[in-house]
From Swiss-Prot:
Belongs to the UDP-glycosyltransferase family. Keywords: Transferase. InterPro entries: UDP_glucos_trans (IPR002213). It comes from Stevia rebaudiana (Stevia). PANTHER family: FLAVONOL 3-O-GLUCOSYLTRANSFERASE UGT89B1, GLYCOSYLTRANSFERASE. It holds the Pfam family UDPGT. GO terms for molecular function: UDP-glucosyltransferase activity. This is UDP-glycosyltransferase 89B2. Transmembrane segments: none annotated. UDP-alpha-D-glucose binds at residues 287, 347-348, 365-373, 387-390. The lineage of its organism: Eukaryota, Viridiplantae, Streptophyta, Embryophyta, Tracheophyta.
Length: 468
C-alpha cells in the first residue's frame, strides 16, 4: 500500500514566516504534502492570506487557513504584516511579535476536535518547538536556506564564536567542524547573530528560537542530496539523528511558474521568445535588496557596454530609498538599450524567466531560492552576495564550480568594464567548466524530483514520519 494511502487524514499545521523568500518555498512544500493526502492548516496573519489563496483554491478539501492577528509591537507600524513592508530596523521585531502568538495558537489547538499531529514552521519561528512539546506533538523546522548555510547558522548559535578584536569587522570566524572548514569575515555573518546582546530580552528570545530549531524533531531543507550531500550528512551528525529531509528543489507546480509575476509576466516571456537560446543575461537581487544609485549606475553601464541582451528586475524604491539615493535606474538608460533589454519594476516571474531557453546567465545576490531555481534551470550564476546566508551560498556555488564571483557586500561598487566583460564572456564561452558543471547539477536536480528521485524519496520519508 502506498505511504500516501496509509497516512490519509493526518492533520499538519504549517506556519510560514511572512517574508516572500520564506513563504513561497514552504507553500510549495505544502502543495507536495497535500497531494500526498495530508490534511493541512496554514497559519497566517490576515494580510498574508492572498499569498496562500492559490494553494487554498488548488486543494479546497485538504488545505485550510487559520487566521490569527499579528500581535502589536512598538517597532512595527500599524497595518504592516509582511517583512517586505517593514522599516529597515524592524526585522527582529517581526520575529518577536510572532512569538506572542504562542498562547492564541495553544488555545486554538486545544479547541480543535481533530488538532494537528505535527507542526512544520520556519526556522525564524523556533518558539513553536516549545509549543509542540507542551502539546505533546512533533515540530519540524523548515529551512529556507540550504544545508551549508544552515550548518553555519546552527554553529553560530550553538557555539557562539566571538571576535578577538571587537573593532575588527574583517576578523575571520572559522567553522572547523563544518566540512571544508569554511571561514567568513565577521561582517559577513548573519546580522541577527552579530546584533545579539547577551541579556537583552529580544536577543535572548531569538537565540532560544534557533537553539529550539536545533532541538526540534526534524529539519526540512529546500535542497537535494546530490548538491549538498556532505552538508546534509554533517547536519545529521551534529543533530545526532537522521531526521534531516532534503526535499528540493521546491518549485511552483506545473504551469504556475508565470502566475506569480503579475501582469508583466506575459510581456517578459513573449520578449524572451524572440531571443536565441542562451543569449540573455538575467539580473535580479531578490525581493528585498535595493541597490545604491552608484551600484545601479555600474550595473547599467556593464549591461550597456557588454551589448548583451538582458532582463533586469528592479525592486521599486520607496520614497525613503529615493531620498537616500537608492534604487534609481539611470536616466536615459532604457532608451539607449531599447530592443536589447528590459527593465522590469516590481515582482517578476523568476522561475519562468530562468527556465526559458533564451536565458543563459544570472547575476544574482545568491539568495537560496534564486540559487535553487537557477540550478534547476541550468543557468550559470554570476555571484554578488550581500547579506545573511548569501555568503555561504556563494561559497557553495564556487566550491561546486557552478558560479563565478563578481564581488561581495552591499556597499561595494564593482568596475563596469569588468562587469561588461563577465556578461559577454559568460554567455559566449560554451567550454568553461562552470557551464558544464551547472548542466550536470541541473540534470541531478531534475532526477531528484522525478520518479524514484532522492527528493521524492525524502518527501515520502517525511510524510511517513509526520504520521508516526
Amino acid at each position: 500500500m502506498p505511504i500516501s494511502d496509509i497516512n490519509a487524514g493526518s492533520h499538519i499545521l504549517v506556519f510560514p514566516y511572512p517574508a516572500q523568500g520564506h513563504m513561497l518555498t514552504l507553500l510549495d512544500l505544502t502543495h507536495q504534502l497535500a497531494i500526498r493526502n495530508l490534511t493541512i492548516t496554514i497559519l497566517v496573519t490576515p494580510k498574508n492570506l492572498p499569498t496562500i489563496s492559490p494553494l487554498l483554491a488548488a486543494h479546497p478539501t485538504t488545505v485550510s487557513a487559520l487566521l490569527l492577528p499579528l500581535p502589536p509591537h512598538p517597532a512595527i507600524p500599524s497595518g504592516i504584516e509582511n517583512v517586505k513592508d517593514l522599516p529597515n530596523d524592524a526585522f527582529k521585531a517581526m520575529m518577536v511579535a510572532l512569538g506572542d502568538l504562542y498562547n492564541p495558537l495553544r488555545d486554538w489547538f486545544r479547541n480543535q476536535p481533530n488538532p494537528p499531529v505535527a507542526i512544520i514552521s520556519d526556522f525564524f519561528l523556533g518558539w513553536t518547538h516549545h509549543l509542540a512539546v507542551e502539546l505533546g506533538i512533533r515540530r519540524y523546522t523548515f529551512s529556507p536556506s540550504g544545508a551549508l548555510a544552515l550548518s553555519v547558522i546552527f554553529s553560530l548559535w550553538r557555539y557562539q564564536p566571538k571576535r578577538i578584536d571587537v573593532e575588527n569587522e574583517k576578523e575571520a570566524i572559522k567553522f572547523p567542524k563544518i566540512p571544508n572548514s569554511p571561514e567568513y569575515p565577521w561582517w559577513q555573518l548573519s546580522p541577527i547573530y552579530r546584533s545579539y546582546v547577551e541579556g537583552d530580552p529580544d536577543s535572548e528570545f531569538i537565540k532560544d528560537g534557533f537553539l529550539a530549531d536545533i532541538a526540534s524533531w526534524g529539519i526540512v531543507i529546500n535542497s537535494f542530496t546530490e548538491l549538498e550531500q556532505v552538508y546534509v550528512d554533517h547536519l545529521k551528525h551534529e543533530l545526532g539523528h537522521d531526521q534531516v529531509f532534503a526535499v528540493g528543489p521546491l518549485l511552483p507546480p506545473g504551469d504556475k511558474t508565470s502566475g506569480r509575476g503579475g501582469s508583466s509576466s506575459n510581456d517578459v516571456l513573449s520578449w524572451l521568445d524572440t531571443c536565441a537560446d542562451r543569449t540573455v543575461v538575467y539580473v535580479c537581487f531578490g525581493s528585498q535588496m535595493v541597490l545604491t544609485n552608484g551600484q545601479m549606475e555600474v550595473v547599467a553601464l556593464g549591461l550597456e557596454k557588454s551589448r548583451v541582451k538582458f532582463v533586469w528586475s528592479v525592486k521599486e524604491p520607496t520614497v525613503g530609498h529615493e531620498a537616500a539615493n537608492y534604487g534609481r535606474v539611470p536616466p536615459g538608460f532604457e532608451d539607449r538599450v531599447s530592443g536589447r533589454g528590459l527593465v522590469i519594476r516590481g515582482w517578476v516571474p523568476q522561475v519562468a524567466i530562468l527556465s526559458h531557453d533564451s536565458v543563459g546567465v544570472f547575476l544574482t545576490h545568491c539568495g537560496w531560492n534564486s540559487v535553487m531555481e537557477a540550478v534547476a534551470a541550468e543557468v550559470l550564476m554570476l555571484t554578488w552576495p550581500m547579506s545573511a546566508d548569501q555568503f555561504s551560498n556563494a561559497t557553495l556555488l564556487h566550491e561546486l564550480k557552478v558560479g563565478i564571483k563578481v564581488c561581495e557586500g552591499s556597499n561595494i561598487v564593482p568596475n563596469s568594464d569588468e562587469l561588461a566583460e563577465l556578461f559577454s564572456k559568460s554567455l559566449s564561452d560554451e567550454t568553461r567548466l562552470e557551464r558544464k558543471r551547472v548542466k550536470e547539477f541541473a540534470k541531478s536536480a531534475k532526477e531528484a524530483v522525478g520518479p524514484k528521485g532522492s527528493s521524492v524519496g525524502e518527501l515520502e520519508r517525511l510524510v511517513d514520519n509526520l504520521s508516526l
